[in-house]
């Protein structure tokens, strides 16, 4: 059946989120377990989409009173216009409406001029208000007007210059992406007794316009939407009530293999040597029978009793008609209940 192609792949659990002092800007997102190779596949795809395809806002042009072109200088302003433009490129902006929009800055020296002094409309936020734009000497003043727009990716300055641009308008390279940095790494992780699975660790930093967790969610949604066109078959129909899973005469947890329990190597090897494969095999053993197992001591016995107790089980239980026929097929069918 075609659905086995995806249904039989292991699915990761809900991602673990680790944040620092500022959860709105930095986070580490961990997804495990993944099939071997899927860590790199998903990590690389998410990284590329995060850096290139998320919508954001940026300054696209500026006008400074008394400045005709970007190679000018302003009296009483310590930075030249080129440096001011470089500082403006680093403004972090959030827009709650479609652009373009205008912002204005008026400042008088002496002192440092920061992004927090910019006058913005109600639908624009400056996310790094302490960012320095320029420094004014005593008696100096400056007035700037900024054009802000929304978009994605990187747009060079020449694309931001309108054909009817007035004299003195300086187009700016726009980096719209709210994501500043993405790094990922893949480590081996355990599933049962096997280490042949991937753990994906994503480290995401944004400018605050979107949280790292939301950014990853949006990137995943973009990938989902783009990949949808390649699904050219109809999904198998859901099973009818007559085809539904039969009721088991015992706890489905008994179908779980003992090598998936978090046991010490010594205990796991003793069970393996005694041909105990499923939990259903294990719980029918008495304590005396277990202690007769070669190399199996009281410490291993207590460990197993503690693990079983956590599942509501114990040694010496009676399970009629065990083992069932086609036990491996039953284990797959009731995998979600194990």
Curated annotation (Swiss-Prot):
Report the record's Gene Ontology biological process terms: DNA-templated transcription
Q: Which domain of life is it from?
A: Bacteria
Q: Which GO terms describe its cellular component?
A: cytoplasm; DNA-directed RNA polymerase complex
Read off the Pfam families from this record.
RNA_pol_A_bac, RNA_pol_A_CTD, RNA_pol_L
Q: What keywords would UniProt list here?
A: DNA-directed RNA polymerase, Nucleotidyltransferase, Transcription, Transferase
InterPro entries the UniProt entry points to: DNA-dir_RNA_pol_insert, DNA-dir_RNA_pol_RpoA/D/Rpb3, DNA-dir_RpoA, RBP11-like, RNAP_asu_C, RNApol_insert_sf
Instruction: Report the EC number(s), separated by commas if there are several.
Output: 2.7.7.6
Comment field on protein domains: The N-terminal domain is essential for RNAP assembly and basal transcription, whereas the C-terminal domain is involved in interaction with transcriptional regulators and with upstream promoter elements.
Q: What does the record note on quaternary structure? A: Homodimer. The RNAP catalytic core consists of 2 alpha, 1 beta, 1 beta' and 1 omega subunit. When a sigma factor is associated with the core the holoenzyme is formed, which can initiate transcription.
Protein name as annotated: DNA-directed RNA polymerase subunit alpha
Originating species: Caulobacter sp. (strain K31)
Q: Which gene encodes it?
A: rpoA
């Amino acid at each position: 059946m075609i659905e086995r192609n995806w249904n039989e792949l292991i699915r990761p659990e809900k991602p673990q989120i680790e944040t620092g002092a500022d959860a709105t800007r930095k986070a580490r997102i961990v997804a495990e377990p993944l099939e071997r190779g899927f860590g790199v596949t998903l990590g690389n795809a998410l990284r590329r989409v995060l850096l290139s395809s998320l919508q954001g806002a940026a300054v696209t042009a500026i006008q400074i009173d008394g400045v005709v072109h970007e190679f000018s200088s302003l009296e009483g302003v310590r930075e030249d216009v080129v440096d001011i433009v470089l500082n403006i490129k680093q403004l972090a902006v959030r827009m709650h409406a479609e652009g373009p929009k205008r912002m204005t800055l008026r400042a008088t020296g002496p002192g440092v001029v920061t992004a927090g002094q910019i006058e913005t409309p109600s639908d624009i936020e400056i996310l790094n208000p302490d960012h320095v734009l320029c420094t004014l000497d005593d008696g100096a003043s400056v007035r700037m007007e900024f054009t802000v727009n929304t978009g994605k990716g990187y747009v060079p300055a020449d694309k931001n210059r309108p054909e009817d641009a007035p004299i003195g308008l300086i187009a700016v390279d726009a980096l719209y992406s709210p994501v500043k940095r993405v790094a990922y790494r893949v480590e081996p992780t355990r599933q049962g007794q096997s280490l042949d699975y991937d753990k994906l660790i994503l480290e995401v930093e944004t400018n605050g316009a979107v949280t790292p967790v939301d950014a990853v969610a949006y990137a995943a949604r973009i990938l989902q939407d783009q990949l949808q066109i390649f699904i050219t078959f109809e999904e198998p129909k859901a099973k009818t009530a007559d085809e539904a899973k039969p009721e088991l005469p015992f706890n489905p947890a008994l179908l779980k293999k003992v090598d998936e329990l978090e046991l010490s190597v010594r205990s796991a090897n003793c069970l393996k040597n005694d041909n105990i494969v499923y939990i259903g095999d294990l719980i029918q053993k008495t304590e005396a029978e277990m202690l007769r197992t070669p190399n199996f001591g009281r410490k291993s016995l207590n460990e197993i009793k503690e693990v079983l107790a956590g599942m509501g089980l114990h040694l010496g239980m009676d399970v009629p008609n065990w083992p069932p026929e086609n036990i491996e097929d039953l284990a797959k069918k009731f995998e979600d209940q194990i």
